[in-house]
């Protein structure tokens, strides 16, 4: 580790994050490299980093690559210490071609991005109600996916089952199929193809039932948490628990990091991107941003198109003007994002509740 004494006030730190360790580079206010440090991803490692950085001078700001993944723990620690933390994008290829690729190089590029003012994104808070909702929703989605895989596997087993078993189960709905198969008694040591198939099908059916119970428990917690965190959001036309959860997660616990409704629209990928040149003035579709939040806005738009009179009037007007359904939905998503931002901006998401037993 190389250290350079300096009297420059204000230290900027850049951190390249990994699962088990982080690499940090410190710069002074003039952009001079002061030192490099590698720490484990533990509380003691974070404390060592803060002590090391403050040894050069007062720590002003930190640029971290991956504040929502490998850098989440360090981000929480630094924010609790009152340090300004910025989200830094992955280094651009042109920078890597010029300076090479290594952990210290990436960390230095992160620090210089903060020092130059090009890294201005504030990381999401990960210690409040929205983080609780996110963890539960991620688990629920994986359970829903696993349940779908289970029922598909059960039906595939039925296709290749012996004819007698197929005849017994043919024509049953999914719910009745799972209920009937879960009660099979093939014995502990299947001795023929039909018994082995029954054993396998019963195992899959019971897995489906366990996953359904797990999903119900998670949905109960999500309904409660979302209703407590954002009752005004759930009360909006076309917004349900899952849609509200998606939008809350996109904004984060600290929704004040979004400076205005245009920033929220850009985050959700519903803000048209200028694509003008010379006398040609045009915009192109934004295919970036948080795609899950974009999907949530799409669901709200579809619900309002079928049930909300104000939206139906707007759709009829734009259709008469010659717009296609896709174009109308894009406009609706932008308007809906504006409404939702106003609600999110009025929320106070800083007191994590306790999970119900």
Language model segments and positions:
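A detector of single, family-specific signature residues
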Residues: 1-357
């Amino acid at each position: 580790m190389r250290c350079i004494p300096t009297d420059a006030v204000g230290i900027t730190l850049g951190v390249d994050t990994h699962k088990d360790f982080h690499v940090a580079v410190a710069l002074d206010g003039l952009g001079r490299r002061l030192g490099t440090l590698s720490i484990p991803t533990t509380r003691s490692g974070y404390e060592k980093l803060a002590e090391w950085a403050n040894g050069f001078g007062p720590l002003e700001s930190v640029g971290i690559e991956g504040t929502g993944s490998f850098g989440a723990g360090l981000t929480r620690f630094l924010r609790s210490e009152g340090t300004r933390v910025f989200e830094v994008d992955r280094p651009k290829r042109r920078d890597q071609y010029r300076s090479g690729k290594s952990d210290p190089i990436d960390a230095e590029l992160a620090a210089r991005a903060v020092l130059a003012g090009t890294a201005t994104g504030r990381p999401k808070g990960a210690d409040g109600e929205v983080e609780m909702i996110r963890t539960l929703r991620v688990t629920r989605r994986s359970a829903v996916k696993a349940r779908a895989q289970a029922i598909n596997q059960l039906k595939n087993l039925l296709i290749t089952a012996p004819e007698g078993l197929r005849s017994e189960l043919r024509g049953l709905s999914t719910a009745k199929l799972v209920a009937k198969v879960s009660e099979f008694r093939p014995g502990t040591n299947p001795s023929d193809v039909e018994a082995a198939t029954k054993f396998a099908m019963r195992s899959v059916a019971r897995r489906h039932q366990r996953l359904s119970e797990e999903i119900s428990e998670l949905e109960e917690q999500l309904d409660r948490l979302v209703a407590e965190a954002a009752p005004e959001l759930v009360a909006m036309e076309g917004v349900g628990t899952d849609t509200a959860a998606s939008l809350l997660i996109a904004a984060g616990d600290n929704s004040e990091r979004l400076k205005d409704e245009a920033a929220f629209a850009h985050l959700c990928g519903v803000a048209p991107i200028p694509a003008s040149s010379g006398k040609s003035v045009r915009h192109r579709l934004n295919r970036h941003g948080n795609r899950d939040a974009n999907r949530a806005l799409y669901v709200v738009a579809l619900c309002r198109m079928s049930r909300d009179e104000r939206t139906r009037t707007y759709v009829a007007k734009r259709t008469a003007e010659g717009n296609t359904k896709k174009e109308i939905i894009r406009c609706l998503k932008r308007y809906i994002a504006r409404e939702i931002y106003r609600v999110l901006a009025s929320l106070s998401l800083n007191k994590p509740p306790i999970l119900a037993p």
